[in-house]
Amino acid sequence: TKGFAESEKFIALCEYIGNEFPSVVGIRDDAAGEKYTPPHILTTAIKRLNKVAAKEFDINKLNIQDKKCIEKLITYLCAPRFLQVINSYVTKQSRELFESEYIRSTWDKPDLTSDELNLYVNVCMDYVNLKEIEQHKQKLNLMFDDAEGQNELTMRLTEMLKTKAEEYNQCINRIDKMLAKLNGERAKRVANQQQRNASII
């Protein structure tokens, strides 16, 4: 059986809300058709990294490890799946959040595999999902306040809020599980590499 979020009533209610409250649910497609431009040189990558990760890197004062990390970050930001996903977002807010979380998550990990990068893309997609779900909940709460006395509408809005709360919790759980998997696997790999290096020495 279909859940409420897939039901005809839910779809009809969404259409009703879109017609009755256009200013509340409207989202401007302010990035539609614009292609994301990844950084290709160190200075541009450093500027973005400093902005989103609260760093103060200076290209003239980079140590070898930091330079290696930032050079690798440039390749991460040119990865095909990252580009595909970021270009699928039609609002600048979603693109900026996705890019920021991706940079924060990956910039200091120059040894990530392709599979791990794809998982970080998934994590960052869920960060965007969380933001969108939270915005939907806020809008539904506003409409709930405006619909006082309209029993049928308030009942449906209550069901929609419950659905959004469940989506939010599922999203949080997915992020936690993926990060635990990523951090655990990388920690093992780094430990094994250190062990191999020690045995060579």
What residue ranges belong to the model's regions?
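Intrinsically disordered, low-complexity, charged/polar segments
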Residues: 1-201
